[in-house]
């Protein structure tokens, strides 16, 4: 499906984001944090960690994507094992008890925060730059992050043009252009115009992708955790609800 190609400019990218087979090349990475409304909360009033979101004072004041439908959020919760170990499931259950405003993806979380529908939410840090309004992010010790990749088709009609495009996207010039829009990139020393971005990059942890079967299982599990009570179903009933 893909042809092996390692663009020269990507050789200096952090090792943890490189693919060993060189079939795909990372061009940006999307760190996730807690975003908050700066008009409703001062910086010292915002949650200090993901665990802080379980404080009763945030009940009904949080927005997250519906993890039973949004695959990136399901992946984020699943990868919390990297930060919380086996307790990650209990964390997700605790978050569900906070009665969060569930939206369809990460993008609508930020407008909900800006409009004051909620005070805090889980979303990409880049939205602080990409949405206009009173919103900032919480500095965490580690950031689960979603790498995005470019690849050269094995049967590309114009493979040289494809190589040139990929090389430009990961070159210093290309990475600077991409970063100006709030994107976190992998070129050393290149950061988006977001306060504290240089402290985010060294603490990004790439998320693993669940298999297709694992993804289906996670969707069912999160549907039970977040909706089983509303549906009148026991929480230990596996795979009972399909949409």
Spans of model-derived segments:
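Solvent-exposed loop/turn segments at secondary-structure junctions
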Residues: 32, 40-42, 60, 68-72, ...
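A bilobed periplasmic-binding-protein/Venus flytrap-type ligand-binding module shared by bacterial periplasmic
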Residues: 33-40, 147-161, 177-178
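A ligand-binding cleft/hinge motif common to bilobed small-molecule-binding domains
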Residues: 114-137
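Periplasmic-binding protein-like
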Residues: 15-16, 30, 57-68, 92-96, 102-103, 169-191, ...
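Substrate/cofactor-recognition hotspot
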Residues: 165
């Amino acid at each position: 499906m893909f042809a092996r190609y390692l663009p020269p400019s990507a050789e200096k990218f952090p090792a943890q984001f490189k693919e060993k087979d060189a079939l795909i090349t990372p061009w940006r990475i999307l760190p996730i944090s807690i975003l908050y409304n700066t008009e409703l909360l001062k910086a010292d009033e915002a949650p200090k960690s993901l665990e802080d979101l379980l404080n009763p004072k945030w009940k009904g004041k949080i927005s997250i994507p519906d993890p039973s439908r949004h695959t990136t959020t399901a992946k984020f919760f699943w990868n919390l094992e990297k930060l919380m170990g086996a307790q990650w499931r209990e964390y997700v259950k605790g978050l569900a008890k906070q009665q969060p405003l569930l939206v369809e993806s990460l993008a609508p979380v930020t407008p909900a925060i800006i409009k004051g529908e909620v005070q805090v939410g889980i979303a990409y840090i880049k939205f602080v730059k990409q949405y206009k309004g009173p919103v900032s992010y919480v500095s965490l010790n580690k950031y689960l992050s979603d790498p995005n990749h470019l690849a050269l088709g094995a049967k590309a009609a114009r493979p040289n043009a494809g190589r040139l495009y990929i090389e430009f996207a990961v070159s210093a010039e290309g990475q600077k252009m991409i970063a100006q829009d709030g994107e976190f990139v992998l070129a050393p020393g290149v950061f988006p115009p977001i306060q504290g971005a240089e402290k985010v990059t060294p603490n990004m942890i790439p998320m693993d992708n669940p298999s297709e079967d694992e993804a289906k299982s996670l969707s069912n599990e999160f549907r039970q955790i977040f909706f089983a009570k509303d549906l009148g179903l026991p929480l230990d009933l596996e795979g009972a609800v399909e949409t």
